[in-house]
Each structure stands twice: as C-alpha cells, then as structure tokens.
Amino acid sequence: MAVTMADITKLRKMTGAGMMDCKNALTEAEGDFDKAMEIIRKKGQAVAAKRSEREASEGCVLAKTTGDYAVVIALKCETDFVAQNADFVKLTQDILDLAVANKCATLDEVKALPMGNGTVQDAVTDRSGITGEKMELDGYMTVEGVCTAVYNHMNRNGLCTIVAFNKEVNEQLAKQIAMQIAAMNPIAIDEDGVSEEVKQKEIEVAIEKTKAEQVQKAVEAALKKANINPAHVDSEEHMD
C-alpha cells in the first residue's frame, strides 16, 4: 500500500524518529503502525548503541511530592524535539511515579524497578531504540521532612525543585519557597550553611578586586600628580 505524508507524520509524532526512517518503516510494514514501530525500535537500538559516546544534553526533569517525601528525576536525550515528545515525557513521569511509590534511595534502585515486560532501564533502552537517540537516567534526588514541596517550572520539563521542611508549613507558602529556590538558586538556607570553601573563594575574589582597585587609584593619583589627564592625552583638540 502507498504510504502517505499523513501516515509518516503520525508515526513521527508517535516515535520521534526521523521522517525517512518513518517512511521506510511504514513501507516495510505495509502500513501497519505497530509493525512499523517495532521496526523503528530495533533499528534505533542499533543506532543508539553506536551513539553511546555522544552527549545527551537535552531531556525531561520532573518532581513529585507525597507530603513528607519528594523526588526529582531526569531522563536525558540528545535533542529538544525528542525531549518534548509526549511519549518521552510520559516515560519520565511513569518512572518518577514508580520511584516515589517504591521510595527508591538510589538511581540504581530506580533502574532495576519492574516496568512493563522488563525493568525501568529496559524501558529507557526501548525508547532509545525508537528514537535512535542516546538516552540515560542521569539525575535522581530525594528529600524527606515533616512536609515537602515541589515546583515544576511552567510545565517546561526543564527545571524543577524539591524542598523539605522540618515543621509544618502552609502549602501555598511551601510552593512559593520552592519557586523562589528555582528562581534564585541559593547555595544555603543561611550564612551558617555556607561551606568554608565557598567563603574562602569569595574572600579571594574580594581581595583581588580590592587590589585591582587600589592599583587603579594609585595610577590615577600618580598621573594627577604629574598633571596628566589620561582621558585627554590623545585628544585631537590638543595643540602642538
């Protein structure tokens, strides 16, 4: 049967694979979408394996809270097109839900969780095969407290925060704090929480800045004493 552009576009949206890959898969599968997806998956796994050394700099990061427990997880890929694909985002959400339900302590525990006919890692590998892009779970953190809050930035799936509190906090206030953390990226709750290493680096920067300012002032003073205005030395208005 003839493969139409509408069919190719539909399969591309379903899989995130390239237009030509979708066309070839549909042609080979004689228009059967399920068979075409399987063809793309198998071919894509081989391609993805060759891309193992490539950088996966895009992806989806999501956070979730159950009250006293919160989790953030990141699933990475190579392109923004795949990162925005609904199935890729859903896979990230499904993995997050499993991690929260099982209260996994480490990323390795998450990867080993049962999912579908295999494990979470198998599901990621399958998705990588469908798109032909390198994919990896690369980011996992949990917090626990009397209460927790999360912030997912404007549903963009690229920025989120998780916060744990050691006492009850109004839900709206907790969300606002989580949002402010996303906006300001503070390094500590208060000054006492700033590490000595960070403090020392800031002190060194301040010292170097002060030295530079002192040198500049000394130069300006010396020029002034010699009756030289550095702003006018090269002026075309000067007469010989």
Protein language model annotation of sequence segments:
Residues 2-240:
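N-terminal assembly/interaction segments in proteins that build large macromolecular machines
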